[in-house]
Amino acid sequence: MLIYLFEWLSHYFKGLEVFSSYISVRIIMISITSLLITLALGRPMISWLQKMQIGQIVRDDGPQSHFSKRNTPTMGGVLILSSVIISCLLWGDLTSIYLWILILVVIFFGAIGFFDDYLKLVLKHPKGLRAKYKFALQSIFSIVLAIVLFYLLSKNGQMSLSIPFSKSLYIPIGIVIFVVLAFFIINGSSNAVNLTDGLDGLAIVPVVLVAAGLGIYAYIETNSTLANYLLFNYLGNPGLAEVAVFCAAVCGSGLAFLWFNSHPAEVFMGDVGSLTLGAVLGVIAVMVRQELIFFIMGLLFVVEALSVMLQVGSYKLRNGKRIFRMAPIHHHFELKGWPETKVVIRFWIISLILFLIGLAAIKVR
């Protein structure tokens, strides 16, 4: 919205055209805007959640240190999502279909997460939205979206899978493989981030790092000069560069949310935030054709999800025997005696290392 205003004003005031003509400037501005919006609205929202008594539910079989988290305001993810949408409407190119798709993903998965949180925290339904209904909604949306993206992104009905650390190795894939891959990436990422969001600040920092990494890839691949220099396939689809702008909005809002979510957390994002942010990262990875880079950068999320699947499988197949003391795996380390802050910071370090490995693939090819 603002780019059109600055484009008009640039006819009368020299220099303002940088705000409409340069995507790098808009990336900086949208990250600052989303950060400031989240910081400004954070305190009022926390107060409102406290007033409405929308607080965290703590498992009785969890670490004793978690009992102090009971009734901590939850559903703070609404703050992140609202900030991202507002910032995108202000600084995004509203002619980009990819920007609108990402906003639609935020709204749809945000609605699922919001309804799930509302059932658990307000209506006091212990399990919230039933898993089968949640999975069905996620699946239908992901499949439809994958089909749409295939026809938007494909060339002559063909797509390719980029292989990290390789200059020219691309695996051609058709619509069936693409849809199946996108389905697992979007749904898997959504639920993996949701499982990771179990300690103060644990999930939001890896989310910001992965969003930043994918944003860098989006910027490179949609810039013909950079793409050619770094030997990437140039993605010249009109409007696809707005993915980098969207990623910047997620980074800005996520960093500001950490201000309130760091230990001791004043607010949790809830399912409305974690389910949505995970889905958004998955969709972005599919859009910029960097699914394997996403796997590398987001490996922490994968490990968290795998720990739950292994725990459940072991319990069912081995007559109640468990692999971990508690799943997801961050709780296992807590029950081993690691302080919560140590678990979180060590997981952040791992996430940072994975982020750097993912960035190294830009040049080490």
Swiss-Prot record:
The keyword Cell wall biogenesis/degradation applies. Belongs to the glycosyltransferase 4 family. MraY subfamily. Keywords: Cell cycle, Cell division, Cell inner membrane, Cell membrane, Cell shape, Cell wall biogenesis/degradation, Magnesium, Membrane, Metal-binding, Peptidoglycan synthesis, Transferase, Transmembrane, Transmembrane helix. The chain crosses the membrane at residues 22-42, 74-94, 95-115, 133-153, 168-188, 201-221, 240-260, 267-287, 292-312, 342-362. It catalyses: UDP-N-acetyl-alpha-D-muramoyl-L-alanyl-gamma-D-glutamyl-meso-2,6-diaminopimeloyl-D-alanyl-D-alanine + di-trans,octa-cis-undecaprenyl phosphate = di-trans,octa-cis-undecaprenyl diphospho-N-acetyl-alpha-D-muramoyl-L-alanyl-D-glutamyl-meso-2,6-diaminopimeloyl-D-alanyl-D-alanine + UMP. CDD domains: GT_MraY. Catalyzes the initial step of the lipid cycle reactions in the biosynthesis of the cell wall peptidoglycan: transfers peptidoglycan precursor phospho-MurNAc-pentapeptide from UDP-MurNAc-pentapeptide onto the lipid carrier undecaprenyl phosphate, yielding undecaprenyl-pyrophosphoryl-MurNAc-pentapeptide, known as lipid I. It comes from Francisella tularensis subsp. tularensis (strain SCHU S4 / Schu 4). It is a multi-pass membrane protein. One of its GO terms (cellular component) is plasma membrane. This is Phospho-N-acetylmuramoyl-pentapeptide-transferase. Pathway: Cell wall biogenesis; peptidoglycan biosynthesis. Its EC number is 2.7.8.13. The lineage of its organism: Bacteria, Pseudomonadati, Pseudomonadota, Gammaproteobacteria, Thiotrichales.
